[in-house]
């Protein structure tokens, strides 16, 4: 899947392709966060946008025949990129909401998403029952047999069809999203760079309640009768990733009751995470969320009493333990936050293991330690007799090795704007893809240049004067 961004915040033009592991590096204030938030916002909102795009087409087909059905082949075969164009056009119009920014800041923005090859959805099997409550009566059934292009809709309660919101049309749209579009657009979780503050102040932060009180106070009696006006006024003053991080950590006591499919199938990965933080997160009755350091005699600590590294990894830890599943996209803004270089290396190895069990990872980083460790995992993947001996000597596992074909790294940079017949003009902020060598790993110029400058200065200090 390829993304093209134009005039999105500090990014003038950028093209990025998501692979199993996608990394963005670059200096401060060069647009990394704009790329990250823009991609996250689309992957967070595409299902609701798709409902608007498909509503009229679905309603037309539900009115035909005793057993209405949707011919998915007729609607979508060979047309996925056309629909993605419609989705991104609508999404671009809500970028100010995604970033909690002034609308004029994104007035010239465009985003394009394309896929190279469509997947065949005909072999997919699908079945979903819609009930009035978890144990209640069935209102409708949506089904698609493997080998058939037809999504059949059996309605037991006609009232469901006439609902303006949350009715049958929305359920059909969700089914189409699962069958046709979800293979390209993964469920996404983000850990923003503001996650440390969200962890320590999570009890004090309630965006939903704050927005409600502010909205109620700003509307008159007539406007309060309009639910859409109320929702409009309740828009948060925070970017979606920050807002979602806060909402997630505020629910940890409830989320803790769930075990993710990743934790069930690969418990060794949650153990590896616990080794990084030197303990584990626990929810204790009457005490709530605590951090339990490893060791029988160690006291339990609240989040305010815990180290910054424990707080920085809180949401990632609960995501892995309670939400993660194969096919997800995990986005991490600066995974190295508050981590000692030793733990940065350990986190790089955990990220590689996540990639190898089917979780895609997208991250921004300033950490040379993290990149060097990923390079080690790429170099060890050559599996020569020599590298296998090194792997065994230093305790690397086979499930930590990285296939370079599944990795891409982009660096923020500037380039001259090219205008036909007018020569080069103003500088543009963009992304440049790094070269990846099977035997040497990733070339990251943004780190290499700084390190070489420092080494040169120190060499001059040590060897440049009179002895």
Go through the PLM ranges and name each one.
Residues 258-280:
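Amphipathic alpha-helical domain-onset/packing element
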Residues 364-366:
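H-loop/switch region of ABC-family ATPase nucleotide-binding domains
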């Amino acid at each position: 899947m390829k993304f093209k961004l134009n005039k999105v915040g500090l990014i003038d033009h950028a093209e990025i392709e998501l692979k199993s592991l996608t990394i963005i590096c670059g200096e401060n204030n060069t647009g990394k966060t704009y790329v990250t938030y823009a991609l996250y916002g689309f992957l967070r909102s595409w299902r609701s946008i798709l409902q608007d795009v498909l509503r009229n087409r679905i309603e037309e087909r539900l009115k035909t025949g005793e057993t209405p059905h949707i011919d998915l082949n007729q609607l979508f075969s060979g047309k996925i990129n056309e629909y993605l164009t419609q989705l991104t056009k609508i999404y671009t119009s809500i970028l100010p909401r995604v970033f909690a920014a002034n609308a004029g800041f994104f007035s010239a923005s465009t985003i394009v998403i394309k896929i190279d090859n469509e997947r065949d959805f005909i072999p997919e099997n699908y079945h979903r029952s819609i009930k009035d409550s978890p144990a209640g009566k069935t209102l409708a059934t949506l089904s698609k047999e493997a080998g058939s292009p037809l999504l059949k809709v059996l309605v037991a309660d006609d009232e469901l069809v006439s609902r303006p919101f949350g009715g049958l049309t929305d359920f059909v749209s969700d089914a189409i999203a699962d069958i046709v579009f979800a293979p390209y657009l993964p469920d996404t979780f983000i850990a923003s760079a503001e996650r440390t503050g969200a962890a320590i102040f999570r009890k004090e932060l309630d965006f939903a309640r704050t927005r409600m009180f502010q909205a109620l106070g700003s509307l008159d009696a007539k406007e309060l009768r309009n639910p859409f006006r109320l929702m409009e006024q309740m828009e948060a003053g925070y970017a979606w990733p920050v807002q979602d991080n806060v909402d997630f950590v505020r629910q940890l006591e409830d989320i803790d009751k769930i075990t993710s499919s990743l934790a069930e199938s690969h418990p060794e990965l949650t153990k590896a995470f616990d080794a990084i933080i030197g303990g584990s997160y626990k929810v204790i009755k009457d005490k709530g969320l605590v951090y339990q350091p490893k060791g029988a005699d160690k006291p339990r600590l609240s989040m305010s009493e815990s180290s910054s590294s424990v707080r920085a990894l809180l949401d990632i830890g609960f995501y892995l333990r309670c939400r993660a599943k194969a096919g997800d996209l995990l986005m991490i803004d600066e995974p190295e936050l508050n981590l000692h270089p030793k733990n940065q290396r350990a986190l790089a190895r955990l990220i590689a293991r996540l990639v190898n069990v089917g979780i895609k990872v997208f991250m921004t980083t300033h950490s040379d330690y993290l990149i060097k460790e990923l390079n080690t995992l790429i170099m060890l993947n050559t599996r020569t007799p020599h590298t296998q001996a090194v792997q065994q000597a230093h305790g690397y596992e086979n499930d930590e090795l990285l296939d370079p074909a599944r990795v891409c790294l982009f660096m923020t940079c500037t380039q001259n704007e090219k205008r036909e017949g007018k020569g080069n003009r103003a500088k543009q902020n963009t992304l440049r893809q790094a070269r990846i060598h099977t035997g040497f790993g990733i070339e990251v110029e943004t780190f290499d240049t700084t390190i070489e400058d420092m080494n040169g200065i120190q060499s001059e200090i040590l060897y440049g004067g009179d002895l």
